[in-house]
């Protein structure tokens, strides 16, 4: 059983099905509201539903643009990526993370960066030759955009390759572009003031770097910790090496059960 299957089964056993999701919350069949720190490994970093990308997806879908035929949205996706990285780019869409990385290594062997909002390491995105962007859309777990800096050196490298983009429907393409603009706005507006308010409870169990939560709990006790959190109505990342995310905009009181019932995490 995979980690995600384990998490889903644990939620269903305790609370029934998830009937609605909004912001950082999951609303369950048994009437319990869960605070989601996992958010599909960050693909729903801005929360569930209610985003501009979701509205854009519905609007384009209503126009019947669900095929892989040419539309104006390919150009909009390129423009969104160029705005995100503040540089002229050529983009290639892959449906597999490793395929995107393998292509990037051939183009520029000295290093490829995966774009991550609020990344704390000092990366100058505008000058990075190859950047892989995963749009922050929870319904597109298989879209990876390789953004290659548009210069003569990379143009020569690309000339020797037969790279082609995976065709995606206009509705998804439009949503991807809008999701990138959504995250650009969020990066500009959200900062430490939105994250530290949860430290009183969370930093006992996680090291917080920006909005990301890296476990302090010993790896051998992490599964037990995840179940304990679920009993306190908190959903954590099912993967030890995939960070959680603070629940933007939620009242710190959502962690009151975890505060009243702390997890004992001494090593076995």
Predicted regions and their residues:
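PLP-dependent enzyme catalytic core of the Aspartate aminotransferase-like
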Residues: 87, 228-268
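Short Gly/Ser/Thr- and Asp/Glu-enriched loop/turn motifs at secondary-structure junctions
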Residues: 21-22, 204-213, 238-243
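Conserved PLP-enzyme active-site core in the AAT-like
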Residues: 7, 69, 73, 83, ...
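Active-site-adjacent loop/helix segments that line or gate small-molecule/cofactor pockets in enzymes
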Residues: 1-25, 39-45, 60, 74, ...
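Glycine-rich loop-to-alpha-helix module at the N-terminal edge of alpha/beta enzyme cores
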Residues: 35-106
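Active-site C-terminal subdomain of aminotransferase-like
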Residues: 124-220
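Acidic surface patches and DE-rich sequence motifs
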Residues: 28
